[in-house]
Amino acid sequence: MGSLSSEEDDEVSSERCGSYSPSADISESESSSSFSCHRFDGEGASSSIPSSPRVVAGRGFYFPAPVMLPVIGGKDVVWDDKQPDNDLSEIEMMKERFAKLLLGEDMSGGGKGVCTALAISNAITNLSATVFGELWRLEPLAPQKKAMWRRELEWLLCVSDSIVELIPSIQQFPGGGTYEIMETRPRSDLYANLPALKKLDAMLIDMLDAFSDTEFWYTDRGIVLGDCDKDSYNSPASVRQEDKWWLPCPKVPPNGLSEEARKKLQQCRDFANQILKAALAINSGVLAEMEIPDPYLETLPKSGKECLGEIIYQYLTANKFSPECLLDCLDLSSEHQTLEIANRIEAAVHVWRQKNGRRHKKQAKLKLSSWGGKVKGLVNDNERNDFLVQRAETLLQSLRIRFPGLPQTTLDMNKIQYNKDVGQSILESYSRVMESMAFNITARIDDVLYVDDAMRRSISVTESLSLFSINGLNPQKAFSVQSSPHGSPFATPALSVASRSPRRAPPLYSVKRNGTREKGIVGETEKAWSYAGNLSSRRVTGVTPERD
């Protein structure tokens, strides 16, 4: 009996057993080998197949190929190589997101893209605009949008897991000795603020989910205008909604909301307002820690007086300084003007600080010389600049307190644009998104409360008119200002200054630029503040501004 060569053995094994790939999955090969050694009879019992090879005439030994036999449920696991389509689509989306981050949003690959920090900031901002951009109603988020927000935000935030800092740590040897090693932990700002932002995010999503069964509903603006005469449930729209024509109009029942529903709305509003304050605090802290970019400092004027203007500079350098009085004299009737004043104050602060830094360097050089008088003059200038910086910062703080939702200034936008720290970029963009979301929820709640208040007032007026009709009085005659005082006791109004509304009464005098006083005009002094962050005035006027 002749023996076969090794080459013939390889041919036989390749013909009988098929080709073998070294890159095959280990788990798959193990499962295949385990299943190939057993066969199952009709009753479910397994018996082993003889593993010894049998001899084939003229060909040598024949090794039987492994065969996958039926699998009994509960005893073995079925291996499926096919992945669901949704998993494949999520992987493709993740690849696309991270490709944009690595390329810096430059799809040409020429290296002209933005830095990684700005790319992540833009990605979080664009994701929030996609999911929450049309937050026009108090209703739960669609399941698709909610899943998209959680999935893609987790992809973007996973970058922070690799941002760590090294700290010394003491470890012990098994024999009793100790040695010092450097240990990694999350960076302190991310460790403190990122879990808090995730908690605020979850609370806002849960708040929207709670508006699944409400007593109010919404109608498109075109439908409201078209059916104005037919709909008996029409509720008056707020002044803000007349400007924001694309927003749907909230509607309430003819008798208004129930006390329980109104109380729930008020609680949600207070809760959202607290979330807004927390997000603002985190965002302000992160922006304050960012470095001031050089391009911003290069665009500043040479003097603080040029930044502020003549009027603000005179008030700021006066002997008696009151930030509240100065703000009352300024024109803060629009968002653009208020933001412009904030930009001027910030620019003046950094101009004076730059001068102090330069003079400190000159002072250090002049100490070695004999120019004592010049050094004394530089010290006086530094003290004066420090004094002006303190007053300007006090004025800016008072402005932010009066308008807590002031938009980002030019300095803030430059910090975001030129920031290189990825961790700070994640915290700033995430907190800004939470701030915007909390503000929009508060605005939507204010819309519903305003419509409910208007409905209650109309009901009270109707009841008053019906009461006069029951008593036999003509309401038109009773309240007519054209009748004589002798004909109706209601016709003569009480011309008393104290009868005016304390919040809407115009000032009796206004300060002019030259310091003189003149009588105020109601039409000029009573201007509506339409800025998005004026949270304090919304409760008084019932007008809720909108953040674009």
From Swiss-Prot:
Plants overexpressing ROPGEF1 or ROPGEF4 are relatively insensitive to ABA-induced stomatal closure and become severely wilted during drought stress. A similar phenotype is observed in plants expressing a constitutively active ARAC10/ROP11. This is Rop guanine nucleotide exchange factor 1. The keyword Cytoplasm applies. The gene is ROPGEF1. Expressed in roots, cotyledons, leaves, stems, sepals, petals, anthers, pollen grains, stigmas and siliques. Residues 81-462 form the PRONE domain. Gene3D superfamilies: PRONE domain, subdomain 1 (1.20.58.2010). The PRONE (plant-specific Rop nucleotide exchanger) domain is responsible for the GEF activity. The intrinsic dissociation of ROP4-GDP is stimulated 15-fold by the PRONE domain, whereas that of ROP1-GDP is increased 350-fold. The lineage of its organism: Eukaryota, Viridiplantae, Streptophyta, Embryophyta, Tracheophyta.
